[in-house]
Regions:
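Cleavable N-terminal export/targeting peptides
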Residues: 1-25
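Short stretches within intrinsically disordered, low-complexity N-terminal or propeptide regions
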Residues: 9, 13, 21, 33-34, ...
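Transmembrane beta-strand segments of Gram-negative outer membrane beta-barrel proteins
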Residues: 20-34, 102-108
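Active-site beta-loop-alpha junctions enriched in small/polar residues
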Residues: 33, 70, 145
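Solvent-exposed loop/turn segments connecting transmembrane beta-strands
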Residues: 37-47, 72-80, 114-121, 148-156
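Gram-negative (and chloroplast) outer-membrane scaffold detector with strong preference
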Residues: 50-118, 136, 142, 159-167
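A generic hydrophobic-segment detector
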Residues: 121-167
Length: 167
């Protein structure tokens, strides 16, 4: 949990630094990954986490670099997942007054994955998401993470429910 707090503090500090440089564009979200593999569920049914999108003011197509951290279990039975992705978010508008609309997105890249009985391994995969923009830069999204293989029966595949804010 301490690492989760450190990641959130890093994200908030990055927001301040980017704002001072005249750059905008961080999306910070908190939530939990709910793994689909039986081995991962046995260690931690929910893995709290944070994800940060670094948006470039030069990217007109919504491309971002995404870094995340999810952790579940404790002691020797801890599972850690660190997604490092190239992501893209596609906006849409809403017919409902007061809502910013639905959006979709995808990401592809590496998952650094640490499981009981194993050192950190690199798995290749990606995620797909659908989200809802709310007033004030707030948003909620559902993501599905998928990698092509597992490590000792553990896998970071599963659904993540996130809530966040765009700065």
């Amino acid at each position: 949990m301490r690492t989760l707090y450190t990641a959130a503090l890093f994200a908030l500090t990055s927001t301040s630094v980017l704002a001072q440089q005249g750059q905008s564009g961080l999306r910070i979200r908190l939530g939990a990954l709910q793994p689909s593999s039986a081995a991962s569920k046995a260690v931690a049914n929910q893995q709290p986490g944070v994800m940060v999108d670094f948006l470039s003011s030069k990217s007109a197509d919504g491309s971002t670099i995404t870094v995340g951290y999810f952790q579940g279990g404790s002691g020797a039975d801890m599972v850690r997942t660190v997604p490092l992705m190239f992501s893209k978010v596609s906006d849409s508008t809403s017919a409902v007054p007061g809502l910013g609309g639905l959006y979709t997105g995808t990401g592809i890249g590496a998952y650094l994955f640490d499981t009981p009985g194993s050192n950190m391994k690199t798995l290749w995969g990606g995620y797909a998401m659908v989200g809802l923009k709310l007033p004030g830069g707030i948003f909620a999204e559902t993501q599905y993470h998928y990698t092509s293989r597992s490590v000792n029966g553990y896998s970071p595949n599963g659904v993540a429910l996130m809530i966040g804010r765009k700065f």
